[in-house]
């Protein structure tokens, strides 16, 4: 199970790595798995990270243009 605290850490981590560079979804998932893999206690951790990306996208903090990049709204969060 992923707690709200861990979800927030994943969210901030995604925003920070996207602030550095444009990334494809698989790269984001791979980086998050390296960083948080042992802490995500779900049957499908990569789906958990994909869901977090979707939430960020729905909140207009990241945008998808053949890959993800951070938006000005997302930059304000970090």
Residue ranges and their predicted role:
Residues 53-67:
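A short, conserved structural fragment
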Residues 1-26, 45:
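Short alpha-helical segments that sit at the start of domains
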Residues 46, 50-54:
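Short, hydrophobic-biased segments on the C-terminal half of alpha helices
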